[in-house]
């Protein structure tokens, strides 16, 4: 397992260096990633500083629920294509399957590397929310435990969603001749959503804060797991345990399903 993880990590870094037909040093790649993350963090710090108004309204759980939603969305968006490439389009899939290695071991070695990437995106959204809450309201040991366990659960949940969506992407791309069209469509959609959110950020935030109580009622009624995530991050031990079990359970279920059909899917 350890050797498989090393191979997958080296292979992923090699493909990143070769993307676009140009060689780039590892230091340059790391530098670009750090720069992008710093830019994201600055935006999120400003965002969560404004969103602390929910905490003053007695809706601390909603503040953390929104943090969980954003973390999950960012992690899935940032990791889904890498997951699809690493799990289903890796060139050594058939070679590894021909060896006395169980499909679950192959999957786990690759997911271990992917979990690091998913964790980076997840924490990029959660840490600013945690920091702003701590700065304005302080923290307790119980809240910190809730933060740690909830973050771990969201990372597992995000990776499970990425694996499922990666399977769908693999199935679609295997039936499309011009794969560049899919990449172009994805890029255009991303730019449209990005510029819409960027140009309407102030209005969206204002509407969100004005509708806080209505949103809270809707979440409690129709999306209880999100309420549980928010309560767990707010220090509620039962909700923290529920969130942890949910994330681990979904990840285990998806991993089992993928392992059972892995050989058929990639060959």
Annotate each language-model stretch with its function.
Residues 1-93, 103-267:
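Hydrophobic alpha-helical transmembrane segments of membrane proteins
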